[in-house]
Amino acid sequence: MKENLEIDKGIPNSLLWVLAILAGVSVANLYYNQPLLNMIRVDLDITAFQANFISMITQIGYAAGLFFIVPLGDLLNKKKIVLINFTILILSLVVIGFSKNIWVLFVASFLTGVCSIVPQIFVPIAAQYSIPKNKGRNVGIIISGLLAGILASRVFSGIVGEYLGWRTVFFIAAVFMLISTIVIMFVLPRIDPTFKGNYRGLMKSIISLVVKFPPLLIYSSRAALAFGAFLAMWSTLAFKMQLAPFYASSNIVGLLGICGIIGALSASFIGKYVKQVGVRTFNVIGCFLMFVAWIIFILGENTYGGIISGIILLDVGMQCIQLSNQTSIFEICPNASSRINTVFMTIYFIGGSIGTLLAGIAWKINKWHGVAYASMILIIFSLLITIVERLMSKRH
């Protein structure tokens, strides 16, 4: 499977699907904690806000990893970067499993976030080395694997946490990462860097990309705001489901993650039609679906039908926004794909962290309704960026 890759010459399907699977396995580490937050709160005797902070600091770690580590994909051997990150992940997951102190858990969660950025090294590989007509499709395959990992992580952690304890989830996750490390050693070919220079010059070039290509900031910001509204739901769902009339345990919260499978299945379809339909149209559709989802979350807050319908719409809407924007950014400057993706995903997860923080505050003030109103405001701002961008493009 170790074939040399050349830009725009194509990527073997076997390698593509291995990367998609490993993208799912590695990104899952960001989301294992979400169905377990209430269990962790009880076990460590902490407040709901402190438990919510575990999720937020994991997202902040991911944003930091995106900004400081992913750009190295243009400067160093990508395979070496992946192996180092996987090794640190194994250690941080084990530490989480043994954590008795909230501050140790915070630090280990941050490191887990930092080193879970590997899927964002795989995405540029798919974009850069696929033949032009397959770029959207192949990026969609990686994203589908990533989404499947997110969905499976919540289901897995919810069920395992309920029956074997929340700590066992992270020990098993460490084993998954050990297996992933071995797979990467054997299947990922050497991919030479495209940037000539040092790390300082590389980081400076990231800033210059933002200045040189204004659409990059537009694509990133509107996706980030939507992602904030998306994570607001998942970071507080465990608290919502423990209350009347559900009184649900972590395994039920995890199983609700299956509802997002429609979003995962839609990723490849969306990637295929981004050029034909247009990124703006997908953004409007995505914002509409997410806004309706939160209305359903309010009206049907005490029914499984309302919760499930809301999750499905929220997930599909999020994929419309993320994938259309992320696919489009790689056309801006193909030779800087890792750095372009760094800007997008760093801003994207900053938005997710802000959404998680706002959700924690909103939950404290007005529980589920507070989270809903905060999320709807984020979605409106995301839509406004698309509307303003459309009006400005007409003027020019």
Question: What is the predicted role of each segment?
Answer:
Residues 64-102:
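Conserved MFS/SLC helix-loop-helix module at the cytosolic interface between two early adjacent transmembrane helices
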Residues 141-188:
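Helix-loop-helix hairpin linking two adjacent transmembrane segments in secondary transporters
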Residues 2-10, 188-220:
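Juxtamembrane intracellular "pre-TM" segments in multi-pass secondary transporters
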